[in-house]
Amino acid sequence: MASGKEIKGKIASVQSTKKITRAMEMVAASKMRKAQERMTASKPYASRMRQVVAHLANADLEYRHVYLQEREVKNVGYIVVSSDRGLCGGLNVNLLKNVVKSAKAWEEKGAKTSYCVVGSKGMSFFKSVGGNVEANITGLGDTPHLNDLIGSIKVMLDAYESGAIDRLYIVYNEFVNTMTQSPKNIQLLPLEAGSDEELKRHWDYIYEPAPKELLDELLVRFIESQVYQGVVENNACEQAARMIAMKAASDNAGDIIRDLQLVYNKARQAAITQEISEIVGGAAAV
């Protein structure tokens, strides 16, 4: 059994770690609330854009944009949204498992895959396992801006327009609630027609100045809005997962401290009992 001094040293060490994890939990909780506000603020725009584009995909347009055209899938692109930092449980692991599973399914059909990776955790993964990374973005921080994403998004859009990729997906973590975050895999291109009955009764549009000019701009803005929404939502998931992970770490540290206190008390009791026995034994010998 370890000495009382050694056990007290371990207790002090775990208490110090608990203070750190507790502080990180509180910071993550604060950041999560701010990230949720950004996510909630951007959702109506992204949702409305998706609805408008779904109507367009259902419509009989005089100009059929390349983003609306289905073609044989030989190359698949993924925009993978991960985090820059760890200590957020299995958030990135589950996300990357989803990407690998989807990519493997396409590769089994004979398609090639390429990636645009957001976040250093995703980049570390693809450096480790390999993968055709066409673009990457790191260091977005806790307040990502659309301007930081546009360049990398354009790389994938240009690849789609040139025929280098035939289908484009975005994979990010969906914020279900504070306790639950799940990977979400959405097809960005070609744009899918809406399946709702309301969307099938699509609107008739009048295009100003012309369908081509309008759609060229609108559809790019739509893709950018969906990627930005994914990044903002993934950031909220990251903070929620980190808060939960740090709370679990703090709780575990508390359990360890209690166990060590019991061990320390037993060691102290044993030492006192031994001293009493020695005194009694010495007195009896006299």
Swiss-Prot record:
Q: What is this protein called?
A: ATP synthase gamma chain
Principal location class:
membrane
Task performed by this protein: Produces ATP from ADP in the presence of a proton gradient across the membrane. The gamma chain is believed to be important in regulating ATPase activity and the flow of protons through the CF(0) complex.
Q: Where in the cell is it found?
A: Cell inner membrane
User: What keywords appear on the UniProt entry?
Assistant: ATP synthesis, Cell inner membrane, Cell membrane, CF(1), Hydrogen ion transport, Ion transport, Membrane, Transport
Q: Where does the source fall among the domains of life?
A: Bacteria
Q: How does it sit in the bilayer?
A: Peripheral membrane protein
Q: Which Pfam families match?
A: ATP-synt (PF00231)
**Entry-linked PROSITE patterns:** ATPASE_GAMMA
**An example Gene Ontology CC term for this record:** proton-transporting ATP synthase complex
Q: Which GO terms describe its biological process?
A: proton motive force-driven plasma membrane ATP synthesis
